[in-house]
Structure formats: C-alpha cells, structure tokens
C-alpha cells in the first residue's frame, strides 16, 4: 500500500519553513498532496489560485508532490485522495497544543488517518506567513524567508496596494 500524505495549510504565502516540511515529507511518503485551504471567512493576501501557483512553482522539482485546494473537512479531503496520513509542521512547543486538538478531532472523524508531526528546521522556527507579510509590507528584506518567486509576488502585491 502506498503511503499518501496530505500537507494542509493556507500558505499565504508559502515560506521556506513550509517548503522545508514539504520537501522532507516528500522523502518519507510516496505521494504528498499540498492542500491549500480555501476558507472564505479569512481574508488572504493571495487568492487560492495564486497560492497554488506559487506552491507549484517552488515544488516543481518534487515529482511526488501535488498541489490542490480544498474546502470543508480535512479528513474528507484526505479520504478523497486515499491518504493514510496528515503531515503537519511544528515550529515550537506553542504550536503543539493547537495541533493536538485538531489531531484529536481528526481521529474522531476518521481513526484510519494518522497525523505525523515534523519539527521544522530550527532556522525557520520563528517563521510564519504573517511575519513575512508584515516585513514585506514595509519593504523589509525577506530573501532569507521565502523563495525568490514568492518575494517577487509579495513585492507586486504591496506595490499595487500602494498604487490603489
């Protein structure tokens, strides 16, 4: 049986921390579905389509990684992909309590789908999409935080926001 994992997130935008987890997950699992959350209650900077395009660009060399969007329950999406695992990244102990609650709920919904946690590389332990957006908004250097294609997309977004 193939090992198939779903790696969910909003990825608004994708950071080197996200990419670290995706790349390492791609070494462990036969297939990894990067599932971009389409949540209409949030106000993301990038559209779902833009986030998916950025993710596809930065994972294009990973043959076993697929980028899709989903809405609704994660376990329903995982079932639709015949996934037996959910892959989550942890930055710090502070992430663990929230992730444990979500994992417990997912186990109630489908006990056949296991959640695997990977600690992010320590150099990205502080990193979040929110921090990246805040630094980029004020024209700070984000070259060590996101891939070049994401940096360029952020600069375009904030330049157009200023122009509007």
Curated annotation (Swiss-Prot):
Localization of this protein: Cytoplasm
SUPFAM superfamilies xrefs: Nucleotidylyl transferase
GO molecular function, one term: pantetheine-phosphate adenylyltransferase activity
Biological pathway: Cofactor biosynthesis; coenzyme A biosynthesis; CoA from (R)-pantothenate: step 4/5
Keywords: ATP-binding, Coenzyme A biosynthesis, Cytoplasm, Magnesium, Nucleotide-binding, Nucleotidyltransferase, Transferase
A Pfam family that the UniProt record links to this protein: CTP_transf_like
InterPro entries according to UniProt: Cyt_trans-like (IPR004821), PPAT (IPR001980), Rossmann-like_a/b/a_fold (IPR014729)
Site entry (Transition state stabilizer), positions: 18
Entry binding sites for ATP: 10-11, 18, 89-91, 99, 124-130
Residues holding substrate: 10, 42, 74, 88
Family classification: Belongs to the bacterial CoaD family.
Function: Reversibly transfers an adenylyl group from ATP to 4'-phosphopantetheine, yielding dephospho-CoA (dPCoA) and pyrophosphate.
Stated name of the protein: Phosphopantetheine adenylyltransferase
Gene that this sequence comes from: coaD
């Amino acid at each position: 049986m193939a090992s198939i994992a779903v790696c969910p997130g909003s990825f608004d935008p994708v950071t080197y921390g996200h990419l670290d987890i995706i790349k390492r997950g791609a070494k462990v699992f036969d297939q990894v579905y990067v599932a971009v959350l389409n949540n209409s209650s949030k106000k993301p900077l990038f559209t779902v389509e833009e986030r998916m395009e950025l993710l596809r660009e930065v994972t294009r060399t990973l043959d076993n990684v697929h980028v899709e969007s989903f809405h609704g329950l994660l376990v329903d999406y995982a079932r639709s992909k015949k996934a037996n695992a959910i892959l989550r990244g942890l930055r710090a102990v502070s992430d663990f309590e929230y992730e444990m609650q979500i994992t417990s709920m997912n186990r109630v919904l489908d006990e056949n789908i296991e959640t695997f946690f990977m600690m992010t590389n320590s150099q990205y332990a502080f990193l979040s999409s929110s921090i990246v957006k805040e630094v980029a908004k004020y024209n700070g250097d984000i070259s060590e935080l996101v891939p070049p294609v994401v940096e360029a997309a952020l600069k375009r977004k904030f330049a157009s926001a200023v122009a509007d």
